[in-house]
């Protein structure tokens, strides 16, 4: 008999004489002559109650059906007299698929700390909180693909292994097939001729540069994949491996870039509100009681916008004491970003036209010679959600910027070729997917919105 998911069983419009369900037992309560099982299969937040009568043969082994055990049941789907549940199952057959030792099973019927659950990341998807987080993660990923497909973008795949440093920061993971004792070092002159590729190879920090090449042939593209940063930052906002959404659009300027970033954010938020109501309600009750209200505001209201210069003036006039200094030419820190989004504007804000010294070489130099056509989307409780820019399309200006940043022109010969052959204005941005999920769930630690977090000193699973 075909299995029915619990989410579909609970949505039934009429009783069913026989139904088959599989899942994991959340709780078992024994009464005289029968037992109540709460079963969840991960398809939704809600459990379904199964009533096992002592008259069925499998009842003799009901003691082995403990919390965490996997079961396969068939029975009659009937209206439930219990409060808060529409349907329940009167079990006819029960098969224990996999037992779970009640003494050693880590997930008991109590609220576990996030720190503890990170140590058993292979099991935490069975909890209410993390099951909800990962369902929202799945729905958000689908909504992103849906958003770009509806707008005529092509989904492209950019390399994980790269010989380029998009950010110019050098905080990259090196990939080598050489033994440790044979690895290139400064003392050996960084000779890579014996390595697999014959040159230095790293894990990508961004697919942007490669996506630009595809946009300048396909028009509108986006990437959605893992990126890697070897930053030794043990903060709630940083991870060594995370996912990025990076659109690139030919013939677009900074204004179009900002419009796309806002449209994408608001559309995804709107779809999560529509499609994940039960899971969002869990986070709204137990993680952040203002979550749904804030998400509705993001979905309904246009974002604020201000230049970097205006942002600095607002921070200086705020009267607040910040830990980090505020001055033109200094990058905005998280505390500054959150003040602007949470306290001054009270909603997301797009800050644009940053000083060229604090932004990457590929961002278009503005006519003032001091700023670049860059933008960041700042949101409450998170800070920076998106960073983007109009890209520098002028060959001479780009070469000068690469030299200013101390980068090697030869490493970017192919990127410069785009400016030699039919160069056009173009723009794009990067959104950290995990930061979007923190916004959508109210979860404050990036380790809790990715199934297997990779952070300094942590490579379990």
UniProtKB/Swiss-Prot annotation:
Keywords: Aminoacyl-tRNA synthetase, ATP-binding, Cytoplasm, Ligase, Nucleotide-binding, Protein biosynthesis
PANTHER family found in the cross-reference section: ASPARAGINE--TRNA LIGASE, MITOCHONDRIAL-RELATED, ASPARTYL/LYSYL-TRNA SYNTHETASE
Species of origin: Nitratidesulfovibrio vulgaris (strain DP4)
UniProt cross-references to InterPro entries, sorted A to Z: Aa-tRNA-synt_II, aa-tRNA-synth_II, aa-tRNA-synth_II/BPL/LPL, Asn-tRNA-ligase, Asp/Asn-tRNA-synth_IIb, NA-bd_OB-fold, NA-bd_OB_tRNA
Protein's name according to its UniProt entry: Asparagine--tRNA ligase
Name of the gene this protein is made from: asnS
Keyword Calcium: no
GO cellular component, one term: cytoplasm
GO terms for biological process, alphabetical: asparaginyl-tRNA aminoacylation
Family membership noted in the UniProt record: Belongs to the class-II aminoacyl-tRNA synthetase family.
Oligomer status and interactors: Homodimer.
CDD domains: AsxRS_core, EcAsnRS_like_N
Gene3D superfamilies: Bira Bifunctional Protein, Domain 2 (3.30.930.10), Nucleic acid-binding proteins (2.40.50.140)
EC nos: 6.1.1.22
Pfam (any one): tRNA-synt_2
UniProt subcellular location: Cytoplasm
